[in-house]
Amino acid sequence: MKILQVCDKKISGVEYHRLLIPHGKINESEEVEITTAHIIDHLPDSFFHQFDLIVSSSVVSKMGFQEILWKQLKRIGIPVIIDRDDTWVLPHNHPLKKDWVSKKTAQQITYNLQQANAVMVTTEHLANMVSPLNKNVYVIPNAIDFSQDQFKPDLKVKRMKTGHIQIGWSGSVTHHHDLVLLAESFLQLKSDPDTQNKYRLILSGFIEGDAMWKEYENIFTSGYRISQEQYCRINGMDAFTYASAYDMFDIGLIPLKDTPFNRCKSELKMLEMGAKKVSVIVSDEYPYTNIAKNKKNCLAANKKEWFKQIKKLITLPELRSELSENLYNEVKENHNIEKVNELRLELYKEVINASNKV
């Protein structure tokens, strides 16, 4: 089986988890050969004849010539799977909305979803979003490759920890409405006698000079009213190293505001922190409800419970240890890349066989 994966030169977190890492593992098999291309526009038919299947994230044409490229691929008869990890409909306040509209990104993704032989998504909810556009939609959930360096424990980083309980969050510029959920709890932490001076907050993914990240920092420091010893930031890293920040965390915060956009996300952040044996507190919202077992592998919180749950993990080290171990075992046993790749390969074979019968 010869597969062509199409992804950008600069690998995003999405392509890392959905294409590069799964296919790298699959490529270790003697029965599968994976080839990577960054742009497949304007290539001769003979190039595509060597492959049984194309897999691409969101769109096939990275140059924006969707209809032209799809016409060629349909004529050749090579099957195509489009992978999508969240919704293509951005809310009006999304930081990328203006660029999304000017480039007609949503329309391009919609067209690709309609044309594909099959679509891979991360959750059942997202599958329901795609199904009106393409009935051949399959849930291939996110998973962790424990052989990747960033998902191995880094003892050097662990030795750098201070005496404080380290409480961290990691993300991008698109999460302001999620972090607002934590603002009041951070204020309470600094004044509660059972928690003050016992913790340090870590903001991971920081981009110097970005106004949104300064706003994030304002939330984490309660308006710069906590001491320097109780806050630190970790600069943004690439897709191959960002999870190394979790080695600094004792407690991971995963807030998520319930919105139509957020319901299309996956449980990936919880899987990542679980793989690094971090005890986590998650919003009691979909998609985390897929794997979250409150008081067993995490603590769940509604918008009024964040302080209570954070305080609980600061003051109860045995609970931190129990939750982190249980979540690690859940991820290791049920959300490892080898197990999920069995579903992925089964789908690939099914799509190729169906195409050969046409």
Language-model segments: residues:
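Conserved donor-binding/catalytic core segment of Leloir-type glycosyltransferases
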Residues: 4, 158-187, 202
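Carbohydrate-associated surface elements
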Residues: 125, 143
